[in-house]
Amino acid sequence: MKLLWQVTVHHTWNAVLLPVVYLTAQVWILCAAIAAAASAGPQNCPSVCSCSNQFSKVVCTRRGLSEVPQGIPSNTRYLNLMENNIQMIQADTFRHLHHLEVLQLGRNSIRQIEVGAFNGLASLNTLELFDNWLTVIPSGAFEYLSKLRELWLRNNPIESIPSYAFNRVPSLMRLDLGELKKLEYISEGAFEGLFNLKYLNLGMCNIKDMPNLTPLVGLEELEMSGNHFPEIRPGSFHGLSSLKKLWVMNSQVSLIERNAFDGLASLVELNLAHNNLSSLPHDLFTPLRYLVELHLHHNPWNCDCDILWLAWWLREYIPTNSTCCGRCHAPMHMRGRYLVEVDQAAFQCSAPFIMDAPRDLNISEDRMAELKCRTPPMSSVKWLLPNGTVLSHASRHPRISVLNDGTLNFSRVLLIDTGVYTCMVTNVAGNSNASAYLNVSSAELNTPNFSFFTTVTVETTEISPEDITRKYKPVPTTSTGYQPAYTTSTTVLIQTTRVPKQVPVPSTDTTDKMQTSLDEVMKTTKIIIGCFVAVTLLAAAMLIVFYKLRKRHQQRSTVTAARTVEIIQVDEDIPAAAPAAATAAPSGVSGEGAVVLPTIHDHINYNTYKPAHGAHWTENSLGNSLHPTVTTISEPYIIQTHTKDKVQETQI
């Protein structure tokens, strides 16, 4: 009975609970829908725009707008604001447009784009800003545009492209920078980070030198037309191994150096029309294995021996389009003829001449080395290595490379590099070879007395250009078509003597010469030092003589200006003269042996001496003055040295 009651209560509870749970779920769903509708707001099209496709496409063109209109539906995927008068894009203007994929702002008057102007556009893949007044690239505004694929900045007065200008949009695949006519500077790192870029337009940007495009490893199409660079040098397209289309039209190109296109292994289309090209280096297009479309028209081609290889190449690889590649401009009798119609029978051509042949070289291991091979610029250069490998400028080797001028460069030589290296120079009339022997020795320690770089005399038999011209006659052509001349012409070999494969050891004669040179240097040094010491001593002696002469002159001047000095010493013990003696000779005759001394004055008191203008000893016994002229002499100075013993009187 109890069990039956429990089962009845359980079924009753379930019957009541299930409707309550169902009603609660329905209420929650209804509330969520109301909240979503309230947050989305009403989907109304702005009055100045036209909307279609359930508000996913909004067009507001040519409405004279000065700012982005309010109330753009949140589900908009395509927004066109072109041809208005918008001058500034403020931050968070499009924050609510999370589904926007295409934003067209071209042909406005936009001068400033604030940082954060495109916040919220997580789905944006195309941004058009062409034909505006931007002077700088708004790099800060591109933040968080993680899905951006296309960016159009064409025809803006942008003056420079700084480093890392687009590193915030690594997803970019198409970048249009054409017609930047105010552009003056492109940084070396301007395109860093754009490893996904497929298309780049730099046409009509007043570019004078090819910018650094190495970071664009995935680039497939490059537009460079309408610029002003007269030369295309090797390395201009370095790193663009994926490039398929290259347009360089109307850029005043007058010279393309050999090996200029060596890195473009994937190139399919090349347009060089409307330039100033008159000739091209031999085998310029040989590395372009996939090239099928070539445009060379509207160039002043000079149809001579340097153009024969191009005529043959056009017939072989582009036989279906004879008008693609222009006509002869010179000489006069060839003017107007298509390049593919130029025949070698009309010219007298000779094999190339090697102007600077390589020389034998002895060098130690782990050093850098070069073997030069200077040739005419319109010829092609290849090197034959000792192991049979043929190396050109386009070849890739870890340590050995062919430079633009034909030089074979070793970044680091090893013992296995020892052998004969042959420079092979080719043009349409034939080829010329020159060989050199490279001897690599093992590096030895503790050898400071001599260098591994030794001069080796090489006897080279050179052939003059006249002999080559006389020896080589035009290669006959068959009726079936032109054949490459280097398959039938004779090789011109410049013989060079080989150096035995011994390690260079310093000889006794070399050591003696080095010692003699050292002795001569020491002698010269000693002579210079001796001359310096002699000049110094001579100057010192002259200075001493001058000093002595000057001192003697000063002493003579002092003696001349001095007067006589009289020193009188008087002994105080001499007795005074008797009065009788003074009167004993009135007639002036003195007594026997009598000495008459002057009266000694009291020198202690100067005033007692001063009144005596005439000394009494100046008169004789007759009363006549012995010195009548000395009556106005000033009184002498009195110097007392001792008051009791001696008195010194000095008259100056």
UniProtKB/Swiss-Prot annotation:
Record's subcellular location: Membrane; Postsynaptic cell membrane
Superkingdom, natural source: Eukaryota
Residues covered by the LRRNT domain: 41-74
Pfam families (alphabetical): I-set, LRR_8
Cytoplasmic side: 548-652
UniProt xrefs under PROSITE patterns: IG_LIKE (PS50835), LRR (PS51450)
GO cellular component: dendritic spine; excitatory synapse; glutamatergic synapse; neuron spine; postsynaptic density membrane; postsynaptic membrane; Schaffer collateral - CA1 synapse; synapse
Phenotype of null mutants: Mutant mice dysplay impaired startle response to acoustic stimulus.
Disulfide cross-links: C45-C51, C49-C60, C303-C328, C305-C349, C373-C423
Gene Ontology BP term (one): excitatory synapse assembly
Transmembrane feature ranges: 527-547
Tissue localization of expression: Specifically expressed in brain. In the hippocampus, parietal cortex and piriform cortex expressed in proximal segments of CA1 pyramidal neurons.
The record's note on its domains: The last 4 C-terminal residues bind to the first 2 PDZ domains of DLG4.
Record-linked PANTHER family: ANTIGEN BSP, PUTATIVE-RELATED, LEUCINE-RICH REPEAT-CONTAINING PROTEIN 4
Function according to Swiss-Prot or TrEMBL: Synaptic adhesion protein. Regulates the formation of exitatory synapses through the recruitment of pre-and-postsynaptic proteins. Organize the lamina/pathway-specific differentiation of dendrites. Plays an important role for auditory synaptic responses. Involved in the suppression of glioma.
Protein's name according to its UniProt entry: Leucine-rich repeat-containing protein 4
Protein source organism: Mus musculus
